[in-house]
Amino acid sequence: MEAVISFDFQNCFIFILIFLLTFLCFFFFFKKPKDSRVNFDLPPSPPSLPIIGHVHLLLSTLTHKSLQKLSSRYGPLLYLRIFNVPIILVSSASVAYEIFRTQDVNISSRGVTAVDESLVFGSSSFVTAPYGDYWKFMKKLTVMKLLGPQAQEQSRDIRADDIKRFCRNLLDKARKKESVEIGKEAMNLMNNILCKMSMGRSFSEENGETEKLRGLVTESIGLMKKMFLAVLLRRQLQKLGISLFKKDIMGVSNKFDVLLEKVLVEHREKPEKDQGTVMLDVLLAAYGDENAEYKITKNHIKAFFVDLFIGATDTSVQTIQWTMAEIMNNTHILERMREEIDSVVGKSRLIQETDLPNLPYLHAVIKEALRLHPPGPLLPREFQQGCKIGGFYIPEKTTLLINAYVVMRDPNVWEDPEEFKPERFLASSRSGQEDERREQALKFLPFGSGRRGCPGSNLAYMIVGSAIGMMVQCFDWRIEGEKVNMKEAVKGTILTMAHPLKLTPVTRQPPLTWI
Ligand code: HEM
C-alpha cells in the first residue's frame, strides 16, 4: 500500500513539475510580445516554424543569403521571431535610409550583452555599450585621440615599417617561387600594426604570445553566432536563471584577461620616456584622470583592446583578401591600378600612405570590394522606443537586423549590382554634390552608418590601401587555375572566402632594389 501511495505521489510530483515547466516555457518563449497586441500594423511576417519561429534561418551557414532569399520573396521590411523574441529585418537601401535618417539615436544601442562580466562584448565593451555616458565618453576619446588625425600621423611609421616587412616577406616567397595564403599574411600584418599602435609593442613569436592572441581572436569570432543567440534570448532565459553559452564565453574572456593583465603590468614597468604615445597611454591617462567626464576602469581598458582586436583585424584581413581576389579575376582592373600607381608613385620607391589621396582608382577598387563582400554582412541594433517605419509599427526593444550585404546589391540604387565596377565610385566622388555623397553613405554600409558606425574606417582604408597598393605595385601574381573561386563562407559572423586565396608572387621589373 505504501508503495502505491509513494508511486502516486511521485507521479503527481512529476505531473506538477511538467505543468510548471510547460507554463514557464509558454510564458517566457511563446507568449506574444506585449506590443503585438496593440492595434497597429506590424511589418509582414513570413511563414515560420511552430515554437522556434525563424531561428533556423539565423542559424543557417550563410545567414545573410538565407535572409536575402526571404526578403526577395516577402519584402524589404519583415517581422521575424526567435521563439517569441521579435526581430525587424531590413533588406533594401530605401528602408535602411529611412531608418538611419529618422531613427539614428533610437537605434544607437545594440541591446543587452550575452554575459555582462565577459571582456568579449560584455558590459565593459565599447562595441556593445548602450548609447549613454560611457559610450559617449569613449566615442569622443576614440575620435579625438585614439584614432584621431594626430594619432594617425604619429603612428604612420609603424604602419610603413610593417608594410615594408610584408613586402620583403613576399619578395622572399617570390625568389623561392612559393605561394602565399593572402589571408594569413594579411593577418600577420594587421596583428603587428594593431599591437604596436595600441600597446607600443609586438607580441613575441618565440614564447607563443602572437599565436595565443591570434587564437583568441579566432575563438571569439567563432563564438559570435552563439553570442548573438544568447543576446536575443537573454531577457527570457534570465528569468529561468539560465545564461546561454556562459562557459564558452567566459573561457575566452579569462584567457584575454591573463594576456592583457600581463601587458598592463609590463607597460607600467617601462621607462617613462617610452610611454605617452600609444593608445594604452591615452587610456591609462583617462583612467587616472580624477576630473574625467566618465571614470573608466581597468576592465574598460582591457575590453577596449578586445573590441579592437576582434573588430579591426579580421574585417581588414577579409577586405584585403576579397579585394585581391576581385583584382585577380579582373585583369583589366589590375592594369588600370598599375598605371595609376606608376604615374603617381613611380618605380623607384614604395607606395606610401600619403600617396593614397592621389590614387582615387585604388580607393574605388577597395570600396567596390567592400560593397560586394562586406566583412560584417549583418548589422545588429535595437530600437529603444516604439516607432513607425514604412508605415508599420515597430515595438520598443525590438532587435533590428540590417542586411548590409543585400542593401549593397539593391538593384533600385546600384546599377549592375552584381558586377565588380569600381568606376561607380569615381563618378559620384567627382560630382562632389554633398547630398549625393550623403545618400551614397547611407546605401554604402560596409562600416555601418550613423553615430554607431565604425570609427576605424579611415585607418582601415589606410592599411588596406597601402597593402593592396604595395601588392599591385611590386608584384605580378599567379593563380592556380583560370579564375579565383569566389564561393562565400561565414566565420562566426564574418564573411570570408570558402577557399582561402592562394597566390604566387612574381617580382615585377625592374627589380625592387629599394626595398
Ligand atoms: C575593413 C575594415 C573594417 C570593417 C569592414 C569594419 C566594419 C564595422 C562595422 C560594420 C561596424 C558596426 C557599425 C554599425 O553598427 O553601424 C563596426 C564597428 C566598430 N569598428 Fe569597425 N570595421 C573595420 C575596421 C575597424 C578598425 C581598423 C577599427 C579600429 C582600429 C574598428 C573599430 C570599430 C569599433 C570600435 C566599432 C564599434 C563602434 C560603436 O559601437 O560605436 N573597425 N566596424
UniProtKB/Swiss-Prot annotation:
Chief location category: membrane
SUPFAM superfamilies: Cytochrome P450
Membrane topology, as annotated: Single-pass membrane protein
Subcellular location: Membrane
Record flagged with keyword Iron-sulfur: no
Cellular component, GO, one term: membrane
One BP annotation, GO: positive gravitropism
Enzyme Commission number(s) from the entry: 1.14.-.-
The protein's enzyme class: oxidoreductase
Keywords assigned by UniProt, alphabetized: Heme, Iron, Membrane, Metal-binding, Monooxygenase, Oxidoreductase, Transmembrane, Transmembrane helix
The family this protein is said to belong to: Belongs to the cytochrome P450 family.
Name of this chain's protein: Cytochrome P450 705A22
Organism: Arabidopsis thaliana (Mouse-ear cress)
